[in-house]
């Protein structure tokens, strides 16, 4: 008899824990141990699909605890039991409207290090501002 997997069954309603040794070599799923959501993606129900993130082996003296933790495969106890997908409401709005631009009234003069100390940068006018990079002397009017 080889080293089998210790299978744990947890019943939430009674707080009852039952353990059974498993002789078969089938992979343990999250749904075997915990009650999972019906909309849980398959990758969260099967932790064996994650192989760990570290492929390069470092000297143990220079390894951090995060590298050690990230190199190991997750167990069923570390996998999520529910999945709440994010809404794309903000992204869709930003796609249609664009990023926020501050077009407020500025009362102070902003000096630019690129065009020189005696010129005022023109942030909104990209075409006229770009040629200041070539000459280094600032906009010529």
Curated annotation (Swiss-Prot):
Q: Which InterPro entries match?
A: PIRC1/2 (IPR026507)
Q: Which coarse location class applies to the principal site listed for this UniProt protein? A: cytoplasm
Q: Where in the cell is it found?
A: Cytoplasm, Cytoskeleton, Cilium axoneme
Asked if the Swiss-Prot or TrEMBL record annotates the protein with the keyword Repressor, the reply is: no
**Which cysteine pairs are covalently linked by disulfides here?**
none
Keyword terms of this UniProt record:
Cell projection, Cytoplasm, Cytoskeleton
Give yes or no: UniProt keyword Transmembrane helix. Answer: no
Name of protein: Piercer of microtubule wall 1 protein
What is the source species? Salmo salar
Give me the gene this protein comes from: pierce1
């Amino acid at each position: 008899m080889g080293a089998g997997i210790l299978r744990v069954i947890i019943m939430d309603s009674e707080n009852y824990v039952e353990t059974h040794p498993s002789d078969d070599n089938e992979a343990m799923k999250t749904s075997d141990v915990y009650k999972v959501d019906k909309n849980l993606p398959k990758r969260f129900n099967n932790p064996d699909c994650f192989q760990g993130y570290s492929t390069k082996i470092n000297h143990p003296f220079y390894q951090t605890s995060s590298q050690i933790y990230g190199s190991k495969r997750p167990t069923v106890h570390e996998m999520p039991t529910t999945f709440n997908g994010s809404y794309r409401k903000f992204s869709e709005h930003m796609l249609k409207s664009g990023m926020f631009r501050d077009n407020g009234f500025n009362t102070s003069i902003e000096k630019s290090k690129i065009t020189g100390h005696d010129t005022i940068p023109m942030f909104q006018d990209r075409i006229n501002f770009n040629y200041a990079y070539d000459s280094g002397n600032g906009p010529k009017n």
